[in-house]
UniProtKB/Swiss-Prot annotation:
Higher taxonomy: Eukaryota, Viridiplantae, Streptophyta, Embryophyta, Tracheophyta
Species of provenance: Cycas taitungensis
Subunit-structure text: NDH is composed of at least 16 different subunits, 5 of which are encoded in the nucleus.
Record protein name field: NAD(P)H-quinone oxidoreductase subunit 4L, chloroplastic
Cross-referenced NCBIfam families: PRK05715.1-2, PRK05715.1-4, PRK05715.1-5
A GO term, aspect molecular function: quinone binding
Family: Belongs to the complex I subunit 4L family.
Origin: domain of life: Eukaryota
């Protein structure tokens, strides 16, 4: 069970990193960042259940990471919406925010 959860967490993390590196769209990059944070949550819960199933430290950390991910998504989408209103594009390679 431990191996399967860690392998799935590693796959999620790898897909998120690959998408974050290769994506040119800001919304897609935010989605890949969320995928990375979900992979971290999978690993936290897996290690928490494997090492000491009586304590819920990994589960509590997972809740905190989820809350931070929700705040990051809200702020990131608000920034993407503001940039889209000004630039009419969400492509990362077209951003030149020094001349806003």
């Amino acid at each position: 069970m431990l191996e399967h959860a860690l392998i799935s967490g590693a796959y999620l993390f790898s897909i998120g990193i690959y998408g974050l590196i290769t994506s040119r769209n800001m919304v897609r990059a935010l989605m890949c960042l969320e995928l990375i944070l979900n992979a971290v949550n999978v690993n936290l819960v897996t290690f928490s259940n494997y090492f000491d199933s009586r304590q819920v430290k990994g589960d509590i950390f997972s809740i905190f990471v989820t809350a931070i991910a929700a705040a990051e998504a809200a702020i990131g989408l608000a920034i993407a919406l503001a940039i889209y209103r000004n630039r009419k594009s969400t492509r990362i390679d077209q951003f030149n925010l020094s001349k806003w």
